[in-house]
C-alpha cells in the first residue's frame, strides 16, 4: 500500500486568530513525521521497512477542516489534565476550583477546548525536530495559574521522542499525554484485533463504571489486565472485564510508580506488534493508559478508508488519572519554580 505525504497547503489557515501549518521532520534513518501546530498533533508517521517502503501508522485526515471537526482526540496533546477529573472539581491548597463539565458531570481531557484543540506557537524547527509552545492562561476551563507548556517532537533513528516541559505561576494540576491512534499494519488497514500487546506492568489501576479510579492499585495476577506476556488483542478485548468501556480503556501502574526516590528513568512500558512492525513504548510517566479506539466511527481517513471501532490503539503514557483526588497516587500538582518534565518514546523495530 502506498502512502502519500499530506499537502501542506491544506493546513495553511488562520484558526483562533493564529496561523496553522504542517511541518515535516525526518530522521537519519528515514522515519518521517508530519506535525501540525493545531493541537500539536501528529498528522502522519511514516515508518520505513527493510525494503525501503514507508507505512503511515497513525490515523488521521488529509485536510485541516477535517481535523477541526473530529471529536475523538486524534493524535494531539491532551491537557491541561489528560483523562477525567471526577465531578469537575478539585481542591488545591485548601481552595476548591470548578472546571468545565464536558463528560457528564466530569471534566475530560482538559474541558471543552483542551490543548488538543488549541493553536500552538512554533518555537523552533529543524530537519528532525519541532518545538511547540502553548500558554494556558489563568482561569482557562477553570484551572488556576498561567501554565506554559513546551512539547518537542524529535526523530532519532527509528524513535519518535516526545519531550514535555511545563511551568506555572500558581499551584495547579497537570497531566499531559499524546493521544496518537496506531495501526501498525497501516492507517485504514482494518482492525487491531490481530495485533499483539505486551504491557510490562505488575499492577493496574482499578476503575469504576465511569472509568474513574477507585483509588487503589492491584496486582494484575489472575486478571485480564495481566499482559506481561505478549497477548493477542482478539483473545482479550471481549473479556467481560472490559465491557464497561466497550473494549480496553484501562490504566496500568508502571514499575517504580510509588518509589518517592525514583527519578523516573525511561522504562519500557509496552510492546505492540502488528503488520511488519514492532513498536516499543518507553516513558518516564508512571501510568500507561491503553485505549483500543472503542468509540472511533463515522470518520473517513487519509487513504479513503472508513474508520470503525477498534481500528487503532492508543498507548497513552501519563500520570495516574484523577490523581488530584487520590493522595496515594503520584502527585499531579505543579507549583511555581518547579520544573515538570517527562519523555515518551515510540520506538519502531
Provide a role label for each language-model segment.
Residues 3-349:
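An exposed, glycine/acidic-rich loop-and-rim segment of catalytic or binding clefts
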Amino acid at each position: 500500500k502506498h502512502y502519500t505525504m499530506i499537502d501542506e497547503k491544506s493546513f495553511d489557515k488562520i484558526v483562533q486568530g493564529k496561523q496553522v501549518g504542517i511541518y515535516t521532520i525526518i530522521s537519519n534513518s528515514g522515519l518521517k513525521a508530519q506535525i501540525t501546530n493545531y493541537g500539536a498533533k501528529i498528522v502522519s508517521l511514516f515508518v520505513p521497512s527493510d525494503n525501503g517502503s514507508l507505512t503511515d501508522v497513525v490515523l488521521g485526515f488529509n485536510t485541516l477542516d477535517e481535523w477541526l471537526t473530529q471529536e475523538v482526540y486524534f493524535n494531539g496533546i491532551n491537557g491541561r489534565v489528560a483523562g477525567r477529573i471526577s465531578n469537575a472539581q478539585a481542591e488545591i491548597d485548601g481552595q476548591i476550583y470548578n472546571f468545565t463539565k464536558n463528560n457528564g458531570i466530569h471534566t475530560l481531557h482538559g474541558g471543552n477546548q483542551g490543548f488538543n484543540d488549541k493553536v500552538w506557537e512554533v518555537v523552533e524547527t529543524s530537519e528532525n525536530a519541532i518545538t511547540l509552545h502553548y500558554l494556558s492562561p489563568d482561569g482557562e476551563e477553570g484551572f488556576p495559574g498561567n501554565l506554559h507548556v513546551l512539547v518537542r517532537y524529535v526523530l532519532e533513528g527509528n524513535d519518535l521522542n516526545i519531550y514535555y516541559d511545563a511551568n506555572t505561576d500558581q499551584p495547579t494540576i497537570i497531566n499531559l499525554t499524546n493521544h496518537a491512534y496506531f495501526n501498525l499494519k497501516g492507517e485504514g488497514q482494518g482492525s487491531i484485533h490481530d495485533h499483539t500487546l505486551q504491557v510490562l506492568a505488575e499492577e493496574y489501576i482499578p476503575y469504576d463504571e465511569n472509568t474513574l479510579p477507585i483509588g487503589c492499585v492491584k496486582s494484575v495476577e489472575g486478571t485480564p489486565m495481566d499482559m506481561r506476556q505478549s497477548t493477542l488483542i482478539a483473545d482479550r478485548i471481549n473479556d467481560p472485564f472490559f465491557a464497561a468501556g466497550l473494549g480496553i480503556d484501562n490504566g496500568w501502574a508502571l514499575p517504580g510508580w510509588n518509589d518517592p526516590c525514583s527519578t523516573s528513568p525511561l522504562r519500557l512500558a509496552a510492546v505492540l506488534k502488528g503488520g511488519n512492525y514492532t513498536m516499543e513504548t518507553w516513558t518516564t510517566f508512571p501510568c500507561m493508559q491503553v485505549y483500543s479506539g472503542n468509540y472511533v466511527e463515522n470518520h473517513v481517513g487519509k487513504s479513503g478508508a472508513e474508520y470503525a471501532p477498534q481500528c487503532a490503539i492508543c498507548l497513552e503514557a501519563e500520570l495516574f488519572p484523577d490523581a488530584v483526588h487520590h493522595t496515594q497516587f503520584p502527585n499531579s500538582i505543579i507549583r511555581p519554580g518547579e520544573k515538570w518534565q517527562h519523555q515518551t518514546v515510540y520506538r519502531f523495530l
